[in-house]
Amino acid sequence: MIGDIARILLVANATSLGWGLRGEWGHWWGATVPGALCGMSLWLAYGRSGYGWQMMAYGALLAVSLSVGGIMSYGLLVGYATAEKGRGERSPTYGCLALFLTGGLWGFFAGVGLGLLTTGTEYKAGDLAMWAVLASAGALMGYAILVRGLDLHLTPPRSDAWAAFLGAAVSTTIFFALWSKDLVVVANSALGWIGFGSGFSLGAVIHREGDRRGLGFSTWKFMEHNVGFFGGLALAVPAALHNGGPQSLDIGSSWKWAILLFQWFMFYMVITNNLDHWTADTKWLSRRIYAALQMGLILSLIPFIYLARPFVREWSGGGSSLVFVSLVFLLNIIGTAKFIHGWGDLRSRVVATFWIQFALVCLLLLLV
């Protein structure tokens, strides 16, 4: 019983920590972090131990699935939900419902990714190509009907990418429910929607009440952690109910290289975001130093590939928990460092939350 609870809480807290860190970097590149932590923790919780390549593959695929929602805009919706001054006449109820929509769309495609990993249905390249075409067509039609035709705008003058995502979600559901008759993918996508959507809405309500009562912590950051917690919780449920645990993937040499290059690229993106902030916002770095550091980061790919060659050939996948903890530790360091110039009581509490949750994830790993 304790182990079952610990497994679900491991996924929920790992995704929560990832989403809190995602707030440091933002956008789709930041969203690769909670996706990676969610996927890896799902394998550690429900997969077979000693299969580190499987863990990292799940992390990479969930990172891609979750990151696509990063092009949607939701900052103004939080302002509506919290009744922030200057946000127009749209009500907090509107803001919460709109956050359930955008957050749900974010989680929907994460659920699709997890569903494809755990379903018993075998999909060939042609099947996935058919889905990609239908999803793209749905995105175009959704945007054309809702935005161009009906003139619906969630957050004017911000992007209306939500309409394209909604169209893609509808066509994706039709494909998997009616064409493939794959209820595993449909159920996972629905749970992803509910988890991430409710996490956004509930987090916004807590954010509003925290600001109203003058609580001494970052209610915005609490909202971000809340999104990841409920999203991870929702995605952990089908994995917990799936007999035999997650499906093992056939991982050859090309897969291994793709996984490692993804890890390099994820770290490259978040470090670059730190450098952008230190150059454009704080003016710590000159443009020449920024360019030199960027060149160094890009050239680091050469020794990375050289050092990874024996790793690809010889690593059997053992010590997967240590690999996971090491990656989370490094991400925590990078996230902590970004706003080191603005250190104060509030920032101290934000950083403390990262490290307390990191410690909790490590403890839960020992219990699963």
Language-model features and meaning:
Residues I2-V368:
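Alpha-helical transmembrane segments of secretory-pathway, organelle, and plasma-membrane proteins
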